[in-house]
């Protein structure tokens, strides 16, 4: 909501908590109708893609939500953004600096825990193969989001870029792993 207010695009999402677990089937129907499959299911407070799953149907959605709830009592369900995975390191306090944009070429369907730490076949290309104008836009958006959310020190800002060049902020990691 804060990022939307500042014209920073993000995937559409819904959050569910342990409190509203009694009516999951109804929520699943509403969420699938609004966001459409495939969906990404994430525990709110985990890192390294732990507990994140892609759901292509209701059965996978239920399994993914149960997995996410095993890690946290709040779960985010996001629409799938088909595009390239990009990342930017942002460092500083009052006048933060953004690094070059890097691109993650995941060896799996998405950059999950296995793609980061187990399989070792994912690639990180720095700088990403994007034009200078898009590089500037992404770096400026990363700094803007960093400031808007009150980040300090060091963060990694993750993005998706669609085939037509639309950029969506995926998340800000305030304890980034900077995995290769």
Located regions from the model:
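A short coil-to-beta-strand element that immediately follows conserved catalytic motifs
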Residues: 10, 98, 154-155
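Internal helical hairpin/lid segments
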Residues: 123-124, 134-155
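Active-site nucleotide/adenylate-binding loops and adjacent lid/helix of ATP-dependent enzymes
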Residues: 1-78, 82-83
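Active-site-proximal flexible loops/turns
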Residues: 19, 49, 86, 165, ...
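Conserved metal-phosphate-binding beta-hairpin within the catalytic cores
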Residues: 79, 89-90, 146-178
């Amino acid at each position: 909501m804060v990022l939307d207010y500042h014209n920073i695009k993000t995937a559409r999402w819904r959050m569910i908590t342990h409190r509203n677990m009694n009516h999951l089937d109804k929520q699943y129907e509403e969420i699938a109708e609004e966001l459409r499959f495939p969906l990404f299911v994430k525990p709110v407070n985990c890192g390294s893609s732990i507990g994140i799953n892609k759901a292509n149907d209701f059965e996978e959605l239920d399994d993914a939500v149960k997995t996410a709830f095993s890690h946290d009592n709040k779960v985010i369900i996001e629409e799938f953004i088909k595009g390239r995975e990009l990342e930017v390191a942002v460092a500083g306090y009052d006048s933060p600096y953004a690094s070059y944009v890097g691109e993650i070429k995941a060896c799996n369907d998405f950059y999950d825990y296995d793609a980061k730490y187990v399989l070792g076949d994912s690639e990180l290309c720095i700088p990403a193969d994007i034009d200078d104008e898009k590089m500037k836009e992404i770096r400026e958006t990363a700094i803007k989001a960093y400031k808007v959310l009150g980040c300090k020190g060091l963060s990694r800002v993750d993005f998706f870029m669609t085939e037509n060049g639309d950029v969506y902020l995926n998340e800000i990691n305030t304890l980034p792993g900077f995995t290769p």
